[in-house]
Amino acid sequence: MERYQQLFKQLAAKKEGAFVPFVQLGDPSPAMSLNIIDTLIAAGADALELGIPFSDPLADGPTIQNAALRAFAAGVTPAICFEILAEIRQKHPTIPIGLLMYANLVFHNGIDHFYQRCAEVGVDSVLIADVPFEESAPFRAAALRHGIAPIFICPPNADGDLLREIASHGRGYTYLLSRAGVTGAENHGQLPLNHLVDKLREYNAAPALQGFGISEPAQVKASLAAGAAGAISGSAIVKIIEKNVAQPVEMLVQLTRFVTEMKAATRS
């Protein structure tokens, strides 16, 4: 959890926002997945948001679903994902690592065991996409027991009560949803979200990162202008992977270019 606090402190000192890429662990293969993640970090990613492939992803658009299918085809399992996570942490001791996933995978070997494994491999935060705040108590209790930040999604229509709850129980960062629906670069993030960010700040919530539909530098700038601490981009990155599965060198070149441009947009 402290890694997020450190990161936001360092970025504030440099007057920068955070750029956080999302990829599926093991896509398109475990070895290539590690290459991709090293490339994202080298290109300027401030933190990582990583998915554990799941067969029935409710909040994911086709791009992220296909990434899960590629990982499954390469034989990726949750156990292999934890091995990849341990390797990332060993190579990159300070970068915040967040998981974005589904409840079934948390339940699989018991909630407590799941968070214990996260702590062992150096994961900092977990966001469970299909658990609404009002059902989150057992998850957030287990998370805090193991020093993992529970992350909550703040929807664009959140009322004052929900914002207070998220502020009081969330740690690490707050996932600010650009809009309702499924993920995807085509579905542009709707801005501005100033009123939500202001309220979250008033209630002392963890810094807000805006996600869903963030695919170009101008949107990163707009997120920061609305008061968010940074932006998360998933589908646009996973698309680059998808288009270049057969040409890994070109894939890494394009990922480097994309992350470099998105990170540049966080510098005022």
UniProtKB/Swiss-Prot annotation:
| Catalysed reaction equations from the record | (1S,2R)-1-C-(indol-3-yl)glycerol 3-phosphate + L-serine = D-glyceraldehyde 3-phosphate + L-tryptophan + H2O
Instruction: Quote the SUPFAM superfamilies the UniProt record gives.
Output: Ribulose-phoshate binding barrel
Keywords per UniProt = Amino-acid biosynthesis, Aromatic amino acid biosynthesis, Lyase, Tryptophan biosynthesis
Tell me where on the tree of life, at the top rank, the source sits: Bacteria
Against CDD domains, the record matches this protein to:
Tryptophan_synthase_alpha
> What Enzyme Commission number(s) apply to this enzyme?
4.2.1.20
Recorded GO CC terms: cytosol
Q: Does the keyword Magnesium apply?
A: no
Q: In which pathway does it act?
A: Amino-acid biosynthesis; L-tryptophan biosynthesis; L-tryptophan from chorismate: step 5/5
User: What Gene Ontology terms describe what this protein does at the molecular function level?
Assistant: tryptophan synthase activity
Q: Please report which protein family the annotation says this sequence is part of.
A: Belongs to the TrpA family.
Annotated NCBIfam families: trpA (TIGR00262)
| PANTHER family, per the entry | TRYPTOPHAN SYNTHASE ALPHA CHAIN, CHLOROPLASTIC, TRYPTOPHAN SYNTHASE, ALPHA CHAIN
Write the protein's name: Tryptophan synthase alpha chain
- What is the source species? Yersinia pseudotuberculosis serotype O:3 (strain YPIII)
